[in-house]
Each structure stands twice: as C-alpha cells, then as structure tokens.
C-alpha cells in the first residue's frame, strides 16, 4: 500500500511540473546592469533610473554583435557592421545614423562588432610585452625572463650534468671496446695451449714403449747371465 501511495505522489508531481510553463533564463548583463528587450533588441543598461526601461545615452549597449542603439534612449538596436580596427560612431539627436571611425591609440577591434577595446597592459600582470598591439590586434604578453643569477646557477648545473654524462659514456664505450678486443684475442691464445697439451700427451704415450723396452733389455741381461 505504501509503494502505491509513493508512486501516485511521484506521478502527481510530474503532472504538476509539466503543467507549469517553462522559464528560459537569458544570460545576465553582470552586476550593476539590467537586461532589457529581446532578440536583436536585447540591451544591457546600467541601473540609472529604477522602474524605467529606457536609459540615457551611453548607458546602454546592444548585446547582439554588430547591433547598436538607434536612438538616445536606446529603445531599438540597429545593425551596422564595421571593419576590424574601426568602431561605430553615432550621429544625430533623435534617430541615430552611423559611421565607422578608426580605433583610438591604445585600443583595438578584432571583429566587425564596431567596439574598440583597450590593449592588455602586460606590465600590470608582471609580464613582458612581446607585441605592443595595433588597431586590429591585442597586445601579446610573455613571462618575464629569470634573473641573471638564476641563469648562472642553471648554466653551472647543466654543465655539470653534461660532464657527468660525457664521462659515463666514455667509460662505457671503453669497456665495450676492451671486451671486443678480448673476444678477438682469446681464440688465438687457446690454439697454442691446445697444441702444447697434445704434445705433452703424445710424449707421455711414447714413453710407455721405451719403459717396456728397458724392462725387456733388463730381463734379457739377467737371462744372458744365467747361460754359460
């Protein structure tokens, strides 16, 4: 009974959840700003006048790339792209017109959105400036080099390691050459030794008949002495 009640409760929760309209959260504009409009007219405005959707000029920005405020209150956004290295400049009092002007010194625009951004200050993050930046590209930073003292210590360490490796390699090579020479010399030394052994054995084998002849002559001498 308890299992059926639990299953019924879960089913009711699913039905109630499906009956409610789903809310799609749009990305926020960040702290201190409010998002107004939708689609290509989506704007991010600073909190200037609570309760009012429209914001004064220079306090709103269109979220969609290449779109810009078309009036002082930024009620609508208009499409106006610019080439890389340029920014959009609005003209007019009631309805804005646009033109593209070059980015100021120290700023860049890599795309066609018409907004120039400041170059990255490499020294602020403790880096060196590899490329200072221009109107179409940001500055490129690289880590600072190590101090000269650290370079000196590293150089000494590397030299010592290289000397040790060279010494070990030389010793290993010398041992290898010595083993090869020994292998070539050993067969030549064993052949005379074998001949010496064979000659010694042959000499021993020839001594036995001489000893037998000596014994026979001694016996003959004894026998000869018996005969008158």
Swiss-Prot record:
Sample GO molecular function, one term: tumor necrosis factor receptor activity
Extracellular side: 20-153
Per-repeat ranges for TNFR-Cys: 28-61, 62-101, 102-142
UniProt keywords, alphabetically: Apoptosis, Cell membrane, Disulfide bond, Glycoprotein, Membrane, Receptor, Repeat, Secreted, Signal, Transmembrane, Transmembrane helix
Signal peptide: 1-19
Record has Membrane as a keyword: yes
Intervals, Cytoplasmic compartment: 175-228
Disulfide bonds: 29-44, 62-74, 69-82, 103-122, 116-141
UniProt entry tagged with the keyword Lyase: no
Induction details: Up-regulated in peripherical mononuclear cells after antigen stimulation/lymphocyte activation.
Tissue distribution: Preferentially expressed in activated T lymphocytes.
Effect caused by changing residue 204 to G: No effect on binding to SIVA1
GO terms under biological process: apoptotic process; negative regulation of apoptotic process; positive regulation of cell adhesion
SMART domains given in the database record: TNFR
Chain positions carrying an annotated carbohydrate: 36, 40, 121, 134
Transmembrane segments: 154-174
Known function: Receptor for TNFSF18. Seems to be involved in interactions between activated T-lymphocytes and endothelial cells and in the regulation of T-cell receptor-mediated cell death. Mediated NF-kappa-B activation via the TRAF2/NIK pathway.
Assembly and oligomerization: Binds to TRAF1, TRAF2, and TRAF3, but not TRAF5 and TRAF6. Binds through its C-terminus to SIVA1/SIVA.
Stated name of the protein: Tumor necrosis factor receptor superfamily member 18
Species this chain originates from: Mus musculus
Gene that encodes it: Tnfrsf18
